[in-house]
Structures are given as structure tokens and as C-alpha cells.
């Protein structure tokens, strides 16, 4: 199971596009609320009803954690203590940890990008402590995948999907979705 975290102020395309792609690959993705209720409102006033509250999730079996950006969504993720503990443990155990746009700052501020290649939304580079900054849409380094911003949301989703379904399957999916990388 994959867990995609939503905090108030998240970026819609960075939350919806990757989940859609992963579900098209028959992967189980759950939206997890890092807010006070299951309903979380985005940076652009779209409300999404999550599957689970953060405190309801058993992360022991999680195969991947996904953080969308957006503002103040990424800041709200950074300030969520429970999420910080889960992310650090999960990433250090070598499990898939993904963040896009401003959200890689959550990884960087928690020491999870030290010695890794990563990307983020322009202006957030100072938060990627110890990372080698790579100005690409998507950067993969071991168990960490980072994405640059809203325009990279589909490429980010495909990169995550390929970890589970393989690139052959993902390329066929891209063709069906009229995506030309």
C-alpha cells in the first residue's frame, strides 16, 4: 500500500495526478489526512475527502510515502510531528519516499537528502540540506524520488509507478494517456 499525505494548502495536481497513475497500475493508494478532518482543502480551494486520518494508519506495511507540495501544504507537512517521525523511519529503512514541488523541503529539513541527488520547486533549494541539486522534472536516487513542481506531476507519478509495475507497463500506460515524455 502507498500513502499520499494531504495537508491544508496542498497542490491539487501533485496529489491527484500521481494517485490516478498509480491506481491505473492497480496499486493501492490511500489519501491520508494530516489535517483535523478527513476533508482537506487545497491551495486553490478544492476539497478532497481522504481515506484515512493520519492517526489511523499502520505504516509498518507501507510500501511508499508520497508528499505533494503546494503552499502552505508543504509547510503544514513539515510541521506535522507524527509525519516527521514516520518519514524518517520509513526512509532510513530504505522504503520508497517521494516528494514533489515544495515538499522535498520536508525531506531536506529532516536530514533525508544528505548525499542524495534531488530537485524541488525553485526557491526551496536552501531547504535541501546536503543534497546535490539537479534541475530536472524528476530525480531518483535510491529509495527517494523528488519532483520539481506542478508541471512534473505526471512524470513524478510515472516514476513512482515504474518502481512497482515496471517501465514496460508504464510506457503502455503513457501511450494510452497520450503522454509523450
Feature-to-residue mapping (PLM):
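Active-site-adjacent pocket-lining segments in enzyme domains
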Residues: 1-4, 10, 24-33, 52-53, ...
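Short N-terminal binding/cap micro-motifs at the start of the first secondary-structure element
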Residues: 10-15, 39
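Histidine-anchored nucleotide/phosphate-binding helix
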Residues: 19
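N-terminal beta-loop-helix "entrance" segment that forms/cooperates
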Residues: 32-53
Amino acid at each position: 500500500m502507498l500513502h499520499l499525505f494531504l495537508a491544508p494548502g496542498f497542490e491539487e495536481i501533485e496529489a491527484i495526478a500521481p494517485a490516478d497513475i498509480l491506481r491505473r497500475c492497480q496499486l493501492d493508494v490511500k489519501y491520508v489526512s494530516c489535517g483535523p478532518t478527513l476533508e482537506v482543502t487545497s491551495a486553490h480551494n478544492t476539497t478532497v475527502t481522504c481515506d484515512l486520518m493520519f492517526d489511523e494508519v499502520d505504516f509498518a506495511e507501507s510500501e511508499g510515502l508520497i508528499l505533494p507540495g503546494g503552499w502552505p501544504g508543504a509547510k503544514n507537512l513539515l510541521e506535522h510531528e507524527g509525519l516527521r517521525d514516520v518519514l524518517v523511519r520509513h526512509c532510513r529503512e530504505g522504503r520508497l519516499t517521494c516528494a514533489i514541488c515544495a515538499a522535498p523541503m520536508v525531506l531536506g529539513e529532516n536530514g533525508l537528502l544528505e548525499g542524495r541527488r534531488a530537485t524541488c520547486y525553485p526557491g526551496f533549494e536552501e531547504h535541501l540540506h546536503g543534497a546535490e541539486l539537479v534541475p530536472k522534472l524528476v530525480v531518483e536516487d535510491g529509495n527517494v524520488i523528488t519532483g520539481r513542481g506542478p508541471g512534473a506531476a505526471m512524470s513524478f507519478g510515472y516514476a513512482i509507478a515504474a518502481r512497482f509495475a515496471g517501465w514496460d507497463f508504464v510506457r503502455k500506460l503513457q501511450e494510452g494517456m497520450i503522454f509523450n515524455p
